[in-house]
Amino acid sequence: MLATLGVPFDPEAVAFALGSAVELGQRLIVANFVERAPLPLSAMLGYEDLPDPPELARSIAEPARLAHSLGVSVTRLRVKSFHPIPAMLEVVAEQDAGLFVFGPDRSRIMRLRYRRAVRAIRSTVTALVWVAD
């Protein structure tokens, strides 16, 4: 599983996750966890699911496209939550991932948020963990 928190992926994380999925012959889950509060008026008007910015959309789509071209089964997830870090941990547990690659581009994510996520991942996730450092 390759995951980010609403920012583009780190290229090293993509390479590691993709290489591992190809080598192991396992499905690759590409997941983006975003902090979005569902607003009642937005939901009524049909605007609750705004698309990702183009750069982020390309960053999320590229690993999936590459994996698919290499014959790897791919699942793409976009999870919106008030609390994206706990949501990410819940999805990792539900999917029973053997390898979890947390790969947001460090230059695009707030330092405190990244540290919080890494601390939660290391204390909760039972799979092998790769973190972009």
Model-assigned labels for residue ranges:
Residues L45-D49, A93-Q95, V118-A120:
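Short, hinge-like loop/turn segments at secondary-structure boundaries
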Residues G25, G71, D96, V125-T126:
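Residue-level detector of structured alpha->beta connecting loops
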Residues H68-F100:
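Structural beta-alpha unit
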Residues A31, F102-P104, V129-D133:
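Short beta-strand elements of ligand-binding domains
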Residues M1-L45, T124, A132:
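Small/aliphatic-rich secondary-structure junction motif
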